[in-house]
């Protein structure tokens, strides 16, 4: 189905719908986002530059009829200069407003704005490595930084005493809470907001010092304030998951005043590319 969906570009062209021109800020169809899950769920999100009910419904109806495998068909009207949709309303045309991913009997709700690794099979391997490196016995307080939809937090929760997850995107945190409830997990807490504003010394004093910190920041790495708070917290172990070796090396250098690297394991999340998670 993936090549066919990508081939839907021809359908758009045949209908004479203009693609969005970023430089001139004109056109109609901006982007087509596809998310798949190991459960068979399939999400498609079409982003338009402006509303045109007749054209929009014709295109969405075509996708719904041509690809009945789609379980979540949604759209966004984004009239901004940039392509980000995190601050835009996502509307459901057909099906659910999410897909379900599954691993080790746990189910994870993933919405259109929620971060989740694109390679489900390798994501499972990555999370197993993170759990192994965390060395949990069931008695630890764990902080999961940049938790996304709470996948790692919920994944390790059965081996921890308590897990606190922090994430910038509010919708992702709502999904994280739903994921805990969905799996009857009661030892997790989640907070939404800028990491440097939430993870403070006061936060540590209020919630307790973490025995283990698992951090999976974006490509930009961690803010200096976040690193300083981690150094203040002095967890026994830090598991650093990164998609950018350069910023990871920078952050590890800053953490080296109190910590040293004991293990490194790369995970090939994007086969046949130069990208790797470590």
Predicted regions and their residues:
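Short, aliphatic-rich beta-strand segments
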Residues: 34, 40-49, 107-111
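Active-site phosphate-binding and catalytic loops of NTP-dependent enzymes
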Residues: 16-22
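Short, solvent-exposed loop/turn elements at beta->coil junctions and helix N-caps
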Residues: 22-23, 29-31, 266-269
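Short, conserved charged micro-motifs
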Residues: 52-58
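Single conserved hydrophobic/aromatic residue that forms the stacking wall/gate
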Residues: 1-7, 12
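Short, surface-exposed charged micro-motifs
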Residues: 31-33, 100
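Rossmann-like S-adenosyl-L-methionine
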Residues: 55, 63-65, 69-278
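Short Gly/Ser/Thr- and Asp/Glu-enriched loop/turn motifs at secondary-structure junctions
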Residues: 27-29, 39, 275
């Amino acid at each position: 189905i993936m090549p066919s969906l990508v081939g839907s570009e021809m359908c758009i062209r045949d209908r004479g719908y203009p693609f969005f021109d970023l430089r001139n800020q004109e056109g109609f169809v901006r982007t087509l986002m596809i998310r798949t899950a190991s459960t068979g769920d399939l999400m498609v999100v079409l982003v338009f530059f402006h509303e045109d009910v007749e054209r929009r419904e014709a295109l969405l109806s075509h996708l719904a009829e041509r690809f009945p495998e789609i379980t979540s068909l949604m759209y966004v009207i984004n009239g901004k200069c940039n392509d980000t949709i995190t601050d835009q309303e996502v509307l459901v045309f057909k099906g659910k407003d999410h897909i379900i991913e599954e691993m080790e009997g746990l189910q994870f709700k993933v919405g259109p704005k929620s971060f989740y690794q694109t390679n489900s099979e390798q994501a499972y391997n990555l999370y197993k490595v993170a759990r192994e490196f965390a060395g949990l016995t069931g008695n630890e307080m764990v902080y999961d930084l940049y938790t996304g939809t709470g996948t790692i937090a919920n994944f390790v929760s059965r081996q921890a005493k308590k897990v606190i997850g922090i994430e910038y995107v509010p919708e992702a945190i709502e999904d994280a809470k739903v994921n805990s409830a969905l799996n009857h997990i009661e030892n997790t807490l989640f907070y939404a907001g800028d990491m440097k504003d939430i993870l403070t010394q006061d936060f540590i004093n209020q919630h307790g010092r973490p025995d283990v910190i698992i951090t999976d920041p974006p490509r930009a790495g961690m803010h200096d304030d976040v690193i300083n708070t981690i150094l203040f917290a002095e967890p026994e172990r830090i598991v650093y998951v990164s998609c950018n070796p350069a910023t990871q090396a920078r952050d590890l250098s800053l953490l080296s005043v109190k910590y040293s690297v004991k293990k490194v394991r790369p995970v090939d999340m994007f086969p046949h590319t130069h990208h790797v998670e470590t």
